[in-house]
Amino acid sequence: MSTDLKLTPIRDSNCTLCPLGGMASSERDVCRVGSEPTPYLIVTKNPPSEKMKDEIFSYLEEVGFSRDDFSFTAAVKCRVWDANITKTMTKTCANEYLSQEVQRHKYKWILAFGNEALQATAGKAQVTKYRAQVHPCTHRSETKVFPTIAPGAVSRNPGQRASFIADLTYFRTLSEDAGGTSKRLPDRIRMITSPTGLKALRDDLLTCDGFAFDIETNGFNEYEADSQVVSLALSTWDKGATEPQRCYAVPLEHPESAFRGRSREVLEVLGKYMGTPKRRVAHNGKFDLRWLHEFGCHFDLTFDTMLAAHLLDENRAKGLKPLARSLLNVPPWEMETKALQDEDLKKVLKYNALDTWYTAHLYFIFRDQLVNEQPRLGKLMQMMSVPASNIFTEIERKGIWVDREILQTNAKIAEETLADIDSKLMAHVPHRDEWPDNLKEVNFNASNFARWLLFEHLGLPVIARGKDKEDGSPGNPSMAEGVLQMLNKRHPHEVLDLLLSRVKWQKFSSSFFSSYLDQIDDNDRIHTTFKLTGTVTGRLSSGKGDADKVTGRVSNRGVNLQQVPRDKFVKGVFGGAPGHVFLECDYSQVELRVAAAIAREPTMISLYQNNEDIHMATAMKMTGKPASQVTGDERKKAKPVNFGFLYGMSANTFVDTAWNNYGVEVTPHEAEVFRRAYFEQFPKLLDWHRRQRALAQKFGRVESPLGRVRHLPDIYSPDRKVAAEAGRQAINSPVQSFASDLAILALVNITRDFKRKGLKAFSVGAVHDALNFEVPEDEVRIAAPLIKYHMENVPLMKHFGYHMPVPILGDVALSRYWGDKEEVPEDILLDEGKFDKWLKSHGL
């Protein structure tokens, strides 16, 4: 069978089936098909280009197909790539030609890429809903259709690549009856409907070696009044097993459940035994444990397949369904989860049970990889990821305390201030007769009205523009906050002052206070979500949706604590509940310290070992002055120099970064001088940059000192920009992941020490390089030094065999409110008498 492709001209260049017919001609060929009949037909929206054809083939070959297996055709035969082709046209018009092809060649399977292809071949819409499922072909009953997203969607969003490959892998299993590693369904799902069934489950929990569990709920927030657990499922196994052996499903708050109205009682009983087995596994178990703990079922995880999947390959999709498709070759088991209590009970229980069954299979795969193939990652999983997940379960349940009265007062002030700003801005708006015809209403946001007001009516100069328009004309004048700040510095104007102030107060009002007022609970606390798998570097993220947990439902639980502004007006609404103190311990220059260690840069290491000021040292190098003559502004400029050039930033990029991130104005010439001086002072950083890029080129990955891996397949991209970005990630990823892992390891040790000492202090979260705590007033004298000690003394050598050549320092600050926190000098913190006086002098 030939792999050559031939081109077939359009059937009828004078076609009038749809409005696109008049655009067609016979000058070019439009439909690509194999030169001989093939078992599989690929259908795309439009005829694929040669580049896209080769890209599709590379995906198919990756999962084990041959090019000889496929023909190509298009749902739409017209050459007009930018035409507004509707699904109706695809279904009612273009199908006439497609139907002839399918019937003539008698294809066994159609691989439909994208919505239009799915519509044309199976008569269905929403490829995201029907992907990776088998559908009958509307043109030939013997032909089966397997839809997935279009390759172009993967090109636009590389994050979808893993799930796309998972779909193709499953398609190969189905179409070739490959079998392979496909995992069988459980022989039986034991649906527990009586006390006798609960007793049988209890007996299994008392003797089994481990289990995987999952719950189905009626929402995302366990603390809400109407929250209910719809069902609980478990898959268990005995010691020495290599796959799950038994599967249970317990109906709870479902109309057809025998335990309806008694779910808390059932969960409390099961909770007495679920902590007994040595291995307790879930996929994104933090979600499940929040709910189970809320309903009296208390135990901790020992393994989480989502955490393991992320550690082993941070680039792949981490949802249970795509992992099961790609690693287990199992059929989809999707269902609509928005209203489970309205669904048939048996359907819900089967869905719930299969979640646990395949989670258990993934557990055995990942456990083997972490123990036998990637033991350093296994150590991170054991020492950090799983314990941290259990800790964040409780952090998320408790939430962070908010002073409701201050919140309401500040929200009102923000609204009034915003209204006052708008009133003052209106004084600068000319009469409606002077407006251009295209402007219909006043809009002080980044709008055409605001651009006209600034750059035409007021005549302020344009110092930056957006991207050029499609017709080649210059882009619109930029209204970015940093650009307006720079413009105001160069050309001060009251309107610019007001607009910049408006940006600030609008954020306060809409992005923060409005959200906080909606989310504060009856206990004056706001709950959020912390993601240990939210970034490819491993850095903790906050406030993400729980979409990985339940397909089809997204909930932004609480605030993103990482984005709470430093401004006291916002930060000051958070604090310690009555009788408590808010404490923050922040790592000092941790990325610079970690980079110095990884790069083995002797000058940086020496500065930190001698407790010298690295920003002052850099300022001295930049200016050629002794420390006594360096001005405050010169030292201020050294800070962005140290953090900006650390990873090899260009001088041009530094100009924007220094202004946008640090408010420091630097000329292009100064940036060049600073960059040269920086690497003259720390020359080994350049050697480190080259070393990291070389490692990425050789292995396609780099590692942190603790063994966390950053896979960088883009380092081999023919696109120079893409490859260059991968090279930059090879440098900064190990630093950022190591710094983040230090904080999480410290949190694990702090929490354990709290429990050992019987302290009631607890963490309320982590923000960047800092850990935040709520501490009872009578425990501050014990907890504060303890927190600082553990942040500065993570046992890296003991657990990971790594010696840190520079000291890691943590600065403790505390107050009633987050926005009022004040740093406690180390000599005072570590002296019980001095610390006691300091606390009393601060009213604590």
Model feature map: region roles:
Residues 37, 57, 61, 122-132, ...:
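Metal-dependent phosphoesterase core characteristic of DEDDh/y 3'-5' exonuclease domains
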Residues 41-44, 148, 211-213, 282, ...:
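Short hydrophobic beta-strand that contains or immediately precedes a catalytic carboxylate
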Residues 390-397, 461, 489-492, 527-528, ...:
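Conserved catalytic core of nucleic-acid polymerases
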Residues 1-6, 178-200, 816-844:
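Acidic, low-complexity intrinsically disordered tails
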Residues 2-178:
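A polyanion-binding, active-site-adjacent surface
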